[in-house]
Structures are given as C-alpha cells and as structure tokens.
Amino acid sequence: MKKLLTAAMALMLMLFPLAACGDGDDGVIRLNEVTHSVFYAPLYAAINLGYFEQEGITIELTNGGGSDKSMTAVLSGDADIGLMGPETAIYVYLEGRSDYVQIFGQLTKRDGSFLVGRSPETDFDYTGLEGKEIIMGRRGGMPAMTLQYILNQHGYYDGQNITMNYDVQFNLTGPTFANGTGDYVTLFEPTASQLVQEGKGYIVSSIGKASGEIPYTAFMASKSYIQQNGEKLQAFLNCIYKATQYIMTHDNDEVARVLAPSFAGVRPPWEQASF
C-alpha cells in the first residue's frame, strides 16, 4: 500500500496566484471523492488524525462513484473540491467554460486498482488474455484508459482479439462482475478484497505496477474557488502532506487502525488481500 502512496510526497500547487480566504469563511470544504478506497489513505488519515481540525478546516466528504459524477458535483456547486482523475479537468476545459476547473494538488501517481479474475492465477501473465472479456469501466476515465494502455502494450485491441467492455458504470463494475459478466474486472480496494472474501473473484495483478507512473488522482476546483480560497487550499494540502508523512513513518498495522474509522463495516484494511 505504501508504495502506492509515495506520490503524495510530491504534492504541489499549480502556478496560479493564491488569494486569502474570504471574510466570514466557516472553514468547511465540501469534498467529492471519485470513490472511497484505501488508495486515498492520506486523505482519511488527515481527517482521522485531526490534522484538518487543527487548521480550522471541516471536511464534508461525499462519494461521487465515478469521475464524471464527481466533476458534475463540482460544476453544479454541490462540492467545493473534487478528488478524481485529471482527465476530467481537461474535458471541462475543452468545453470552453470561462470558470473552468483547475488542478491544485496531486495525490497519487499510479493506478490504484487491481485486476480481478474468476480463478486464482499465481503466475498471471497479460499474454494469456486473448478472447477474454474485461470490464473496463467508463470509456475515457482513468481506470479504463490505463488498463487499455496495458492491454494495447501486450498486443490486444478491442473487437480484434479481446473484448473491452465499457458499458458498465464505474460504481457498478464489481456487482456486475459478481453477477457473471466478463472474465476480468479492474477494481479498487476494498471492493476487490470483498469479492475475494465472498468467493466471487481473485486478485491477479496490480494495474499500477503494470502501467508505471502516471498522474492518476488529483484535487481540483473551479478557477474562481481557487482564487477566493487560496490560503485554505494551501492549508488543506499541508494536512494531506502531513498525513502522508505519518503513513510513511508508521507500520501497516498503525496506519490501518488510523484508517479504520473511515471504513466502518468493512473488514480491516490489514486483512485485505492486496494490503
């Protein structure tokens, strides 16, 4: 897990002016995350360790269930900040919006999902996927594009020698696979381990290890919000960085116990198959 989190060490602000927080600011940040996963451990650690509270920030966290939905929340004003794939900011910019969305901090530098199959494959190799159907997620999203890149690198092309299924919404990929669709699916934790525990799947590969480093998940907000809340966003990133330092200097059991309150009803992270 810690290898996937080292990207947070490189958190940085984009090159734009930071304005002071407006008068009467209550310190609340409404944050919509693309999915709820231990992949974003620094965020939950910062919440549970009280780092945001120390900075006078209150996080109101909601789960978008996909980058498209998280971006919709930001654009509609239902969320102040979105945590999602950077491609969504590009899509919005290309629409020609005047108050477009900007990335102000990077959280991860790899795909954090895992390829899940229907049988255990201790010696899994991407060269053995010819003729298989893989549930990719939403076309144009980071999970789908990253997996497509891996498959293309191994000579697979949709409709020629493999089926890349883009018809399933991001937050329904796990249940759809569990119900019998596809031979493989890409899933984040804790969903991947939940399927393993239910006997409905087996983790066979780390997508992030196979794809290499890419700017995968980032914090973003509208240009106007960033201009009006520069100091608050800097304090927000400071908390994320501080939580990252905690994770990098404590053992897995300690980190898992810090994360546990953010995953009520879920088997402890240290018992998950990919931990």
Question: Which residues does each predicted region cover?
Answer:
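Glycine-rich, positively charged active-site loop/lid region within alpha/beta enzyme cores that binds
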Residues: 24, 217, 236
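Short, catalytically relevant binding-site loops at active-site mouths
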Residues: 191-192, 209-211, 225-226
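Short, glycine-/small- and polar/acidic-enriched structural segments
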Residues: 27-169, 176, 183-189, 200, ...
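Secondary-structure end/capping motifs
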Residues: 227-275
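Short helix- or helix-capping micro-motifs
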Residues: 195
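Short glycine- and hydrophobic/aromatic-rich loop-to-beta-strand nucleating segment
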Residues: 114-116, 218-221, 225-226
